[in-house]
C-alpha cells in the first residue's frame, strides 16, 4: 500500500510539473507561426536614432523557441543592399509574465552605432500581433511605438511600425515591410 501511494504521488507530482511547464508554451504558441527565418528588402526608415534615411537595405529575421519552449527569441540584422554595411542588429525575448498572465518583451540592439534597450507587451487580434514598445537609447532618446505583424500566410507576414512618439513628438506611421519566409523549400506543382 505504501509503495502504491508513493507511485500515485509520483505520477501526480510529475503530471503537475509537466502541466506547469506547458503554461508558458500555451501562452506563446500564438507566435509559433513566426518560428523560422524571414527576410525583406526595403528602404531604411530614418526614424530610429542612428538609422540612415531612405537607404536600400536587406533585413534578416529569425524566430526560435528557447529554454524548453518557455520563451521565443527574435533576432535580426539589417544591412545595406549594396555593400552589406550593418544598419540594425538586435534581439527581442518574448516571455509569459506570470503576474499579469500576458506576453512581455525585452529588447536590445544597435541602430547604426547607437545602442538601445526596451521593453514591451503583446496583444493579439485575429492574425495580427501588436507589440507595444518603449525604447531608450544610450543618448537618452525615448521612443514609444507599436510593431504590427500581420500573418498573410505560412510564407509571409507584413511588418509595420505605427503610433510613434519620440521624445514627446508624434511621427507618422512607417510603410509596411513585406517579410517572406526563407527556411522552407518552395512547394513543387
Language-model features: locations:
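Sec-dependent N-terminal signal peptides
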Residues: 4-16
